[in-house]
Amino acid sequence: GDFIKYLFIFSCLWSANSFAITQTQWDGNFRVEELGEQLNDGSQVFLQYNLKIDSKNNRASLSMTTWHAGITCIGDYSLKINSGVLALYYNGDEENACPYPSPQFEISNKGKAYYIKGKMFSYSQPGEWLPLKRITLK
């Protein structure tokens, strides 16, 4: 257990001396899915948001897979940590590409569980934290 303790102390010192986000717990590929309304042909609106977070370079990128829904706000984001919550700010041409106010997404982390909220999630309650899956890309 000493090594872990040492690692923890070291990482605390490290983050105190560094203004960039060094919390690698945020790094990786994440996915959240939303199901929307049922359409006349029996199919259902489906949205899958894929986030790749690279905290060392202070950036994230969003790609989407969707059926029957418009795609907005895809592309690059910059990161800020605000009282333990990771906020994502869209870097693109806001007006045309992303109609939602910054930060577009907020991510919180409790243990191994991740949650995300954002105005883009139109099929959830406003301000609702949705489960965010950390995925391992093959």
State where each predicted segment sits.
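Sec-dependent signal peptide recognition
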Residues: 2-10
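N-terminal signal peptide c-region/cleavage motif recognized by signal peptidases
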Residues: 15-17
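N-terminal helix-cap/turn-to-beta initiation motif at the start of protein domains
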Residues: 19-31, 53-55, 134
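Tryptophan-anchored aromatic micro-motifs
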Residues: 22-45, 77, 86, 116-118
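Short beta-strand segments that buttress and anchor functional surface loops
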Residues: 31-36, 61-67, 88-94, 117-119
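N-terminal glycine/threonine-rich, aromatic-flanked beta-hairpin/loop signature
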Residues: 41-81
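Edge beta-strand at a domain terminus
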Residues: 69-87, 111-138
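An anionic, turn-rich surface loop/hairpin at beta-sheet edges
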Residues: 87-107
